C-alpha cells in the first residue's frame, strides 16, 4: 500500500489552496515528477516536520543519480546532520527565505520523493543506517554521557511528546505524569531525555540535557550513546532509525499510515 498511499498524497497539489502553501518563487517553475533532469538544477523543499526531513533523506543518494545539481531547502536544525552524510548536497535554511536568490530549473517537495522512488515496500532504501553524526558531536556526547552515567549501566533515551502545535499531537504524545511512575520503578538503567519542553520533575528519574540539544547532530550523537531508544511518533524515532539504533516506537491505536498495518518492525 505504500506506493498507492504516496500516489494519493500527491493530490495535495490539486487542492484549491495548494498555491498558498508554496513559496511564490516556485509557482512559475515546473514541478519535477521523475523525468530526466541530467545537467539541470533541482530545488527540493522540506515539508511538514523534522522527522519527515530525516525520513526522506534516504532518497538523497537516488536524487544524486539523476545527474542534476540538488539544492535542499530545509530546517536549519537539520543542516549539520545532513551535511555529514551528503557533502555534495547544497543545503539552504528555510528560515533564511533565500529561495528567490537561487536559479533552478524545477522543484519538488521532499514528501514527493517516496512517490517518485518508492515502487514497493521491499525496495524502500535506507532500511539500515543511512545517516551519521559528526565526529565532533560524537566526542562531546560520549564524554557527557560517560560523565553522567559512569560504568556500564544500560542507557535508554526517552521521548514522550512531540511538537505541541502538531495537529495530531493530542493523539501521539503522552503526558509526562503518565510515564513518570514507570520510569521510577526501573532499576539499573540510566534514562536520558531526547526531547525539549521537559518538566522539572523529570530530573528525578532521568538525565535532562535538552538545553544542549541545539541541532539534530547533537540529538543524533546523544542517541548513538544509548543502548535503546523509546519514543512516541516524533522526529526522534526517525533520527534513531536513520542512525541504526534499536528503537521501540509507542503508537496510538489510530496511528500514521506510514507505520504499516502489522508486524513488530517497520521499513522506515
For the regions a language model picked out, list residue spans one by one.
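Alpha-helical solenoid repeat scaffolds of the TPR/TPR-like class and their adjacent stem/linker regions
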Residues: 1-228, 233-268
